[in-house]
């Protein structure tokens, strides 16, 4: 029986991405549903982590055309470069675009968000600097570089799905090139292994 795609749904205990900061306060990314707030880890963060942990980015080559982008050419394409499996847009000369062969949803918490704010500062560093300058960190905190900050912390069970397009793996239609069956299978296995052992801590 021919299978065109593979989908798996994952439940894992993980931290969240951070979104916009207000002053020295960093807040986690959230989604609103049924009048409740749920923390999340973005699909972009998950995808990057999977590409790194699977080893897909080990052969990544980049170029600069206004912004850094993945290097693509007739000699270097998704059929022979695993780093391009997650999709690319290259604008050097002729513009080439290839969609990713695997897709992720955001990882959304199973339970609604309960804020846990953590407070920190760089007191030790500021005290060291104040001592060198002969000033008091208590009375001249600003001059000593004392900086208190706080951030929301969240680690909870989150749910996400990944779908792999088995017909697209290892294929680059921009250059009419395609990897062999063994290479395609190795890429799929690498993605699944990465999900199983994925680092579930993210900051920033």
Regions found by a protein language model. Name each.
Residues 1-204:
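RNA-binding basic/glycine-rich loop and surface signature characteristic of RAMP-family CRISPR effectors
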């Amino acid at each position: 029986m021919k299978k065109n795609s593979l989908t798996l749904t994952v439940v894992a205990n993980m931290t969240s991405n951070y979104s916009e900061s207000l002053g020295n306060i960093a807040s986690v990314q959230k989604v609103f549903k049924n009048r409740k707030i749920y923390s999340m880890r973005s699909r972009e963060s998950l995808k990057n982590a999977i590409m790194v942990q699977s080893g897909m980015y080990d052969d990544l080559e980049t170029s600069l055309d206004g912004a850094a982008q993945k290097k693509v050419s007739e000699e270097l394409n998704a059929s022979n470069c695993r780093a391009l499996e997650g999709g690319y847009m290259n604008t050097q000369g002729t513009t080439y675009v290839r969609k990713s062969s695997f897709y992720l949803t955001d990882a959304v918490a199973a339970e609604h968000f309960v804020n846990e704010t953590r407070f920190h500062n760089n007191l030790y560093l500021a005290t060291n600097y104040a001592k060198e300058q002969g000033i008091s960190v208590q009375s001249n905190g600003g001059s000593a570089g004392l900086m208190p900050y706080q951030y929301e912390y969240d680690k909870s069970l989150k749910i996400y799905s990944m779908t792999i397009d088995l017909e697209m793996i290892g294929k680059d239609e921009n250059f009419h090139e395609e990897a062999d069956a063994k290479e395609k299978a190795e890429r799929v296995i690498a993605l699944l292994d990465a999900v199983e052992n994925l680092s579930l801590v993210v900051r920033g």
